[in-house]
């Protein structure tokens, strides 16, 4: 059947699951207002009701045996199709460079590989907003669904799907189709949720315009679904708790390094070191150092004892500056050589994508935090060591010398000469905000022009909803992390130049972030997230790592800035969700998690069935990870310090 909406047409069809087969609902049973159909005693129906520029729907089923009902929508005859299921599907998930078999690819090729298929369905609560969308040249359509339904047997979970070439839809009840993507490289058996009697509802959208029209649809659904966490503790308590944990638990005085630590409760609750944190950026180094510097102002005298007991942010930045490589003109990726003596091969080399090279992500992250800290100290009338500026200028001059004519920075660089090895990826965007900070510190116009050229280049990927190639452990999957650099760079350039294009870049960047940042509460099945926890405000890392991580919180300050300069409270609300999310996660320790102390925060939070692979020592499932990887809580420490200082500045 055909549905008319906003002077455009959607093809709509339905199918019900009878045992293991999908049975189409006859088109003769369908009208513009829905359908009503009975098969062997099973009754299925749909009702459509116009509501402004959207179409509300209700699906119902009442059957003698457990069943499901799918609603298919299609937009045939268009070009440049691009499917979106937030957190899961962005086009084909960059299949051109992805390694088949690592994570879902929406494609017809490699049918012999479990994670390559022309149709993908997930639990709706796997998506940051429970909807499936289809973009094409000139339009965007989407169907949103309530992620959960009441049934005769209790709560069932509903589904969202994407299908080549031009279809998408939702399911009352769900099937992980063709398989369950729990973890990269390892397919799990398909699971499903069925019921005899249940109903669900939602809205259908059909907009003209570019792919970024999807952001308005997300915004409208957010207004209906938002359910923010309600933390108990204050920001100051959180900052103190994390700093104390850094200093008194995770710093290893004998090794002279911060460490990542883990345990396995209930058998083993002592947090033991499993990896030294020696990388200069991304998962260590500057990511830790900047918030440690902020703690001095956020906590005052209360910061001095823990900082004295461990390694201060200033000491970390000294080591980062000392990692300068004269041959490459960049920073070595490690502050100290690994066990094999390499100064660049961090933990990520085990994934096989990069080795014996500089990575733009680690180097860019490090120099971003180095220049950000220098800018912060300068703004507050405080000095910083000359070698920090010397290292930052040398690295960023090298990066500018090697910048491509179209604005791109490299993904990897040679360690032996000043040369880009691989251009493909978003990781180099981290150099852009560093260049703006350096301009603010030195007045060097070349830095500003280089950053502007870079943001113009990377904006193409942001507006196309297709930012890929930032982390080195995801095989250049579409990810959330690179866009964080784009947001920071756009904010700094708008502050510096006042150009309207950079304000638009910020809006596009925020919209892309909200395709990863949950706008509603999910109901995970397992400890510790089945005790009232809300996913609202947490952001998923990539299509390769299907879990929420804390990195998105670092742009909350930029979202609050965007709210101020636009007068649009939507961005402030999204930032407030994030602050509440991170504080509630801290409060799960130790009572709900069964281990640790207040101030720990894992990098893995499982709002649905993605990556819920952790197990207690007695075999019970755990919806997080028994590892305290310092970068994760460092991101939260950064966001908490910045918000606390913003609040105190307003009071002053």
Annotated model-derived regions:
Residues 2-390, 394-397:
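Carbohydrate-recognition beta-sandwich/jelly-roll modules
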Residues 235-275, 308-335, 387-409, 445-469, ...:
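Long, well-ordered core segments of solenoidal/helical folds
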